[in-house]
From Swiss-Prot:
Keywords: Ribonucleoprotein, Ribosomal protein, RNA-binding, rRNA-binding
Binding partners and assembly: Part of the 30S ribosomal subunit.
PROSITE patterns: RIBOSOMAL_S17
Protein function: One of the primary rRNA binding proteins, it binds specifically to the 5'-end of 16S ribosomal RNA.
Cellular component aspect of the GO annotation: cytosolic small ribosomal subunit
Name of this chain's protein: Small ribosomal subunit protein uS17
UniProt keyword tRNA processing, yes or no: no
Swiss-Prot/TrEMBL GO biological process terms: translation
Organism: Leptothrix cholodnii (strain ATCC 51168 / LMG 8142 / SP-6) (Leptothrix discophora (strain SP-6))
Lineage: superkingdom: Bacteria
Family: Belongs to the universal ribosomal protein uS17 family.
GO function terms (MF aspect): rRNA binding; structural constituent of ribosome
Keyword Cell inner membrane assigned: no
Pfam families referenced in this protein's UniProt entry, alphabetically: Ribosomal_S17
């Protein structure tokens, strides 16, 4: 590497790889917080059948923009409270009106 490339590499900030997940908002009752249900499919260890697994995450929603039924993308962040370590980054799909 030349001297110029070394200086540029040293000046560039370190890129942090954060996990991102996509899920459905199942609760928006708390202030600045939404509960997101993330579903995934996994193979059963003993029987080999593909089964649905799910987990709920509490995510930070600063302005209260996201409502029940919205599909959102969440990314991992620093701990914001006892149970909240995720932040909603974008809206993937708006909830359908029934």
């Amino acid at each position: 590497m030349s001297e110029a490339q070394t200086a540029v590499a040293a000046a560039a900030p370190a890129v942090k790889n954060t996990r991102t997940l996509v899920g459905k908002v199942v609760s928006d009752k708390r202030a600045k917080t939404v509960t997101v249900l993330v579903e995934r499919r996994a193979k059963h260890e003993l029987y080999g059948k593909i089964v649905a697994r799910s987990r709920k995450y509490h995510a930070h929603d600063e302005n209260g923009d996201y409502k029940m039924g919205d599909v959102v993308e969440i990314s991992e962040s620093r701990p914001l409270s006892k149970t909240k370590n995720w932040v909603v980054t974008r809206l993937v799909e708006k909830a359908r009106a029934v």
